């Protein structure tokens, strides 16, 4: 195979007879999963920045104390990977912290439930009902379910990044105030 050739593998019975619809369906599933993974990554960061800043603000602001708090939250961050915290588990952590409003947290739940559907159930269910063979159905599903969830997940992720940036600015200010070099 030529190095410049691309090979795309998929189930040819999905959107049977319409290659463009099939490719769009698979591409959008992949993109949704990417966004959900980025949201999961950003929720880890949000929890750690929130915990660091709120803990710093509870007491005396000293170099040693800030270093200790940041180290503890760095450990927590790595623990979330080691213990395989999922989007659902991270959302539960956020609910316990009351960082965000409940309607925002509800969006995380919705995105997570849809992620579970896409990753674990959609193709299994299709074995029984076989709806995804019909290109028109696949196009409707993509336009009415998949693309709106991509848009929602993208918007929510952008909002989370803004909240992270606010916490990050506060944390960097506290670090600068006590002489900790911010990388």
Regions found by a protein language model. Give the residues of each.
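Flexible secondary-structure boundary motifs
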Residues: 51-106, 113, 117, 121-126
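Long amphipathic alpha-helical segments
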Residues: 32, 48-53, 125-129, 151-183
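Charge-enriched, short contiguous segments at helix-coil
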Residues: 95, 99-160
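Charged alpha-helical initiation segments
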Residues: 1-30, 165, 169-183
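Short, hydrophobic, well-ordered secondary-structure elements
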Residues: 28-51
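Amphipathic, well-ordered alpha-helical segments in soluble domains
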Residues: 35-38, 42, 86, 114, ...
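Generic structural concept
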Residues: 33-36, 40, 70, 91, ...
């Amino acid at each position: 195979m030529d190095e410049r050739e691309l090979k795309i593998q998929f189930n040819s019975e999905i959107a049977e007879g319409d290659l463009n619809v099939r490719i769009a369906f698979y591409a959008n599933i992949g993109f949704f999963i990417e966004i959900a993974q980025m949201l999961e990554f950003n929720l880890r960061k949000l929890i750690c920045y929130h915990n660091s800043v709120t803990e710093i603000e509870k007491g005396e602001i000293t170099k040693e104390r800030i270093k200790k708090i940041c180290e503890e939250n760095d450990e927590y961050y790595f623990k979330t990977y080691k213990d395989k915290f999922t989007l659902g588990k991270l959302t539960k952590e956020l609910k316990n912290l009351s960082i965000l409003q409940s309607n925002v947290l509800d969006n995380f739940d919705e995105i997570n439930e849809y992620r579970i559907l896409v990753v674990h159930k959609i193709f299994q269910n299709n074995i029984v009902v076989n709806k995804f063979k019909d290109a028109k159905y696949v196009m409707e599903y993509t336009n009415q379910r998949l693309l709106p969830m991509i848009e929602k997940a993208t918007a929510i992720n952008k909002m989370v990044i803004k909240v992270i940036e606010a916490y990050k600015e506060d944390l960097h200010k506290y670090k600068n105030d006590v002489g900790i070099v911010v990388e």
